[in-house]
């Protein structure tokens, strides 16, 4: 997904530094630009942040229109702070264009709003792993969304139980949110481990609590969409 403003800025680009989770179709907006892969791929190949900063500065000093293309929204787990600091250290001005973060793309694909009238007035976004490499799950909001959780689903189920979530709490897992092949499966805290197989090797977000509940109004649109979903086993 890309916003209209993002697409317009991309069309002007001379150089594009892009992340791993970028749809290749976006190249159509800037076919004449130089595209530089600076992606991080979980446990695979990753471009170090210092190297990304250096490439960004080099491109900005040589070209008038440079785009740093990120998946989702740059201000949500996008390392935006480091890159802004690098640019500001050299007196280089830039514009930050908002994007569609995975939590929102997942909510749209699953048709399960993150906030619900009367039951869901707070949302927490967090990574499944801390910066120390420890799996952590909390219960600080009505809806908890965990990013980059695909490899930790069985362990996350246990951590959610330890954090006080009842075993029957609704859980929604969406992998490759915002892509044409996005996949939604529905579970409970107790059965979350079942999501490991269908979402294997796919970037996933896990929504727990109010934002994972099914809508009570089964509209025709929702009914058609849910035909492609896996219902939870409690």
Question: Could you describe each region identified by the protein language model?
Answer:
Residues 1-2, 28-29, 44-51, 104-107, ...:
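Short, charged, surface-exposed secondary-structure boundary motifs
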Residues 4-97, 190-199, 233:
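Class I S-adenosyl-L-methionine
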Residues 18-19, 67-71, 94-99, 116-118, ...:
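General beta-strand structural signal in soluble alpha/beta enzymes
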Residues 21-23, 39-46, 100-102, 119-123, ...:
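Short, acidic/turn-prone active-site loops that include or flank metal/cofactor-
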Residues 22-23, 75, 102, 152, ...:
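Alpha-helix capping/helix-boundary segments
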Residues 34-40, 91-95, 114-121, 166-173:
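Short hydrophobic/aromatic-enriched beta-strand-loop microsegments
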Residues 51, 61-66, 79, 122, ...:
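A contiguous loop/helix-start segment that scaffolds small-molecule binding in enzyme catalytic cores
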Residues 73-141, 183-186, 234:
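Class I SAM-dependent methyltransferase SAM-binding "motif I" and its flanking Rossmann-like core
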